[in-house]
Amino acid sequence: MSPLALVSVSDKKNIIPFCKELIEQFNYKILSSGGTAKHLIDAKIPVIKVADFTNSPEILGGRVKTLHPKIHGGILAKRTDEEHKKDVETNNLELIDLVVVNLYPFKKTVDQGAQWEDAIENIDIGGPSMIRSAAKNHKDVSVLVDPSQYQNFLEESKKGELKDAYKAKLALEAFQHTADYDTAISNWIRKERDLQSSKYIESYPLIKTLRYGENPHQKAFWYGLSNIGWNSAEQLQGKDLSYNNLLDLESALSTVLEFGYTEKDELKTDMFASVILKHNNPCGASISNSASKAFLNALECDSVSAFGGIVAFNSNVDSDTAVHLKDIFLECVVAPSFDEEALEILKVKKNLRILKFSKDQLPKKNQNSTKSIMGGLLVQDTDDSQEKTEDWISVTNKNANNQANLDLNFAWKICKHVKSNAIVIAKDQKTIGIGAGQMNRVGAAKIALKAAGSLCSDAVLASDGFFPFADTVELAHEYGIKAIIQPGGSLRDQESIDMCNLKGISMIFTQKRHFLH
C-alpha cells in the first residue's frame, strides 16, 4: 500500500518539488486541503482533498477542516497495537505516515499591526493539532514543520527505514514549533489587553552556537528573533561576533539611541553621537555637529580604555570618521549606515567587525529586561522611558546656565548606561571623566573627578543615584564642578542642598533613579 502524506502548509516554499519527490521516489499519496490543495493541484500534483477523505465538508468558513477522527485516528494509530489495529479496521481508517504542516503566520500578522479580529482569525487550530498528534506518535509517523527539513527527510528516506533517533528529533522540533506558536499568541494577548500573567513564557530560536561565553571555559549560545535586533543587523566584515561583543554592542547602541538614530543626516545640529564602550561601560561619549568630531571628543575622555573597545554611532559613518577609526585597535563599529568610501578605509582592518544596524531593526519600546537567578528569572521593564526636563526640579539657590543645562542633560543620559554606582563628569557635550561600578558613591566620584583632573573647572557632574551624604558635593567643589544632576530622594538631601548653596553649585533633582547592575 502506498504511504500517505498529509500536507497543509502556510509557508509554501519548496512544497511543490518536495511533493513531487515523495510521489516519484517513494510512491506517496498526497492528502491536502484549502489553499495548499489548490497550490498543488495548480502544479499538476495529484491530491486527495481532505473533505473527500473524511466525507465531511469544511465548515465555519474554513475554521474546521482537519479536526476529524479519520485524520487524527490515521495519525495517532499505533501500528503494532492490537486494539488500535481493530479500531482502524472497524472505523475504516487509513493510516497517515507523514504530516507536513506549518502554521498560519500569526507573528507576521500581528507585527504588521493587524486588528484584533484579523489576528484572531490567524490563530491556527487544526495545524497544531495535527503536528502534536504526529509528534506524539513519532515512532510511526514523521512530522515536518519547516521547509528546511524537506531535503534531509528525502535523504534519510533513501537510506531505508527511518531511524528512531531521527524521528525523535523531528518530534522535538515539532513540539518546539507549536510551543513557539502558542507563546507568540499568549504574549500578544497579554500585551494587547495589558494583562498580568502568572507565567513568563518566551520563545527564541537558536541563532548560533558561539565560540565560548564570557570566558573560554564557558559554553555559550545565541538565541533570538530572526527579523529584529542583532540577528537582523548586517555584518559587513570581520570575524564572528563573540558573546562579549554582543553584550558590549547592546550597551553601546542603547547609549547612542538616547540622542536619536538615523541612516541619513536628519539629526538636529549637535546631536551626532558617538560612544566608546569597554566591558559593558562607556569609557567615552560625546555629541557634536559631526560623527567625526563626536568620536574624537569621546576618544579624548579615555584613549587608553578605548583600545580594543566597541564604538557606536547614531548616524552615518563617513570617510572623515573612518580615517580616525582606523588609527586605533577596535573590536566592533556599529552605525545605521556607512559611506562606501568609509568602508573601503575601514576594510584595511580585516579583523574589525563592522555592523550596519538600521533604524527598522530596532525593537519596539516597552520590551522586558531579564536576569537569571538560582531557580528563577527576574523580569522588569527596560529602562527606556524618555524623561521630560520640565519634571526636573532645581533645588538650590543658584540655577544652572544654558550651557550647564545642556551638559547636565547630556551627562544624565550617559550616566544611565554606566554600571552603578555611577558618576559622569561632562563638559561641552562630552564626557571627561567616568566612575563606574563602585560600591560607594563617593568612590565613583573620586575616580571620575581624578580622571577629568583640571578639565573639571566649570564642568557638570551626574549621579545615577542620590547622595547619602554631602561628601560628594564637597569633593565636586574641590575640583571646580559648577552643576550637579541626581535623582534626589535621600533622607539627607537637605545636607547636600545646603552644601551646594554654601559652595555656589547649582543642583537638579530628576526624581528618577537609574541604577544599572
Curated annotation (Swiss-Prot):
SUPFAM superfamilies, alphabetized: Cytidine deaminase-like, Methylglyoxal synthase-like
Domain MGS-like, chain residue ranges per copy: 1-145
Reactions this protein catalyses: (6R)-10-formyltetrahydrofolate + 5-amino-1-(5-phospho-beta-D-ribosyl)imidazole-4-carboxamide = 5-formamido-1-(5-phospho-D-ribosyl)imidazole-4-carboxamide + (6S)-5,6,7,8-tetrahydrofolate; IMP + H2O = 5-formamido-1-(5-phospho-D-ribosyl)imidazole-4-carboxamide
GO cellular component, one term: cytosol
A Pfam family hit: AICARFT_IMPCHas
One BP annotation, GO: 'de novo' IMP biosynthetic process
Associated pathway: Purine metabolism; IMP biosynthesis via de novo pathway; 5-formamido-1-(5-phospho-D-ribosyl)imidazole-4-carboxamide from 5-amino-1-(5-phospho-D-ribosyl)imidazole-4-carboxamide (10-formyl THF route): step 1/1; Purine metabolism; IMP biosynthesis via de novo pathway; IMP from 5-formamido-1-(5-phospho-D-ribosyl)imidazole-4-carboxamide: step 1/1
Enzyme Commission code: 2.1.2.3, 3.5.4.10
Gene Ontology molecular functions: IMP cyclohydrolase activity; phosphoribosylaminoimidazolecarboxamide formyltransferase activity
UniProt entry keywords in alphabetical sequence: Hydrolase, Multifunctional enzyme, Purine biosynthesis, Transferase
Cross-referenced Gene3D superfamilies: 3.40.140.20, Methylglyoxal synthase-like domain
Record-linked InterPro entries: AICAR_Tfase_dup_dom_sf, Cytidine_deaminase-like, MGS-like_dom, MGS-like_dom_sf, PurH-like
Listed PANTHER family: BIFUNCTIONAL PURINE BIOSYNTHESIS PROTEIN ATIC, BIFUNCTIONAL PURINE BIOSYNTHESIS PROTEIN PURH
Comment, domains: The IMP cyclohydrolase activity resides in the N-terminal region.
The family this protein is said to belong to: Belongs to the PurH family.
Name of the protein in question: Bifunctional purine biosynthesis protein PurH
Species assigned in the record: Prochlorococcus marinus (strain MIT 9301)
